[in-house]
Design a protein with these regions (language model features):
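C-terminal capping/extension of enzyme domains
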Residues: 201-234
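A structural signal for short, hydrophobic/glycine-enriched beta-strand patches
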Residues: 30-213
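The identity of the second residue at the extreme N-terminus of proteins
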Residues: 2, 26, 36-37
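Short hydrophobic alpha-helical segments enriched in small aliphatic residues
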Residues: 3, 8-10, 19
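Intrinsically disordered, low-complexity segments enriched in serine/threonine/proline/glycine
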Residues: 19, 27-28
Length: 234
């Protein structure tokens, strides 16, 4: 028996239902279909609000930047740092556990053109080139997935004896909720401000318009349900 992965099932239902409801409502004035479409739109809106977490940042103790190959999150962190929004920045990441190595700079490789062995090396270079003093950049270069970003970042701040009462989290827009959940788990007493960045073309406004966006968002929903359910069972 072939088992369809959860995120593929969600994506399939989402795509088919979306196409069916939109097509049906265009062809008929049936009140039930109109009502179904309204319910579906509310569901999509709730999903967007959940996945695309965002806050207005306030003065914090630190800015966290989970590992990735895009420079935009670290650029945003540098911008916030230079505005006096935090005293420290902690980029985190070795490389993806899936790839087994740093897979390279995904955008602006003409600007960030060094040979990087880890995500942390790359993000550090982005921060420095955007005006952040090297001594204000903490180091975490062992994490290979999001939960480890949070775990090892906590170890770094504990070792540095930093009291983190408030923190800013700079991450990819559709990755925001899962990042927040993991970091909040490791910093239960910390107030977080999520500052998401659109790095790969998938945004809150356009994710429903193409398969790549639907894949990204439904994949996040699936991972949150699966990963946190397993964690709670333990």
């Amino acid at each position: 028996m072939h088992i369809v992965p959860a995120h593929q099932s969600v994506k399939f239902c989402w795509t088919v239902t979306n196409a069916f409801l939109r097509g049906a409502v265009e062809k008929t004035d049936n009140e039930e279909l109109v009502m179904m479409n309204d319910v579906y739109e509310k569901f999509l809106k709730s999903s967007e609000e959940f996945i695309f977490a965002e806050n207005k940042p306030e003065k914090s103790d630190i800015i966290f930047v989970p590992g990735n190959g895009y420079p935009q999150m670290a650029e945003k962190a540098a911008e916030l740092f230079k505005k006096g929004m935090a005293d420290w920045i902690l980029p985190s990441g070795k490389y993806s556990v899936v790839n087994g190595k740093f897979s390279g700079v995904l955008e602006k490789s003409n600007v960030y053109d060094k040979e990087y062995g880890t995500e942390w090396e790359f993000l550090r270079d982005v921060l420095i080139k955007n005006g952040v003093p090297d001594q204000k950049i903490l180091k975490e270069d062992q994490a290979t997935f999001t939960y480890e970003n949070a775990i090892y970042s906590r170890q770094v701040t504990d070792h540095a004896e930093l009291e983190i009462e408030r923190a800013i989290l700079c991450c990819k827009s559709y990755h925001a909720r899962r990042c927040l959940m993991y970091y909040q788990l490791l910093y239960p007493k910390t107030e977080f401000y999520v500052v998401p960045v659109n790095a790969d073309g998938i945004t809150r406004e356009n994710w429903r318009k193409n398969e790549e966006g639907i894949d990204a968002v439904t994949g996040e929903l699936s991972r949150i349900v699966k990963q946190f359910s397993l964690m709670l069972e333990r």
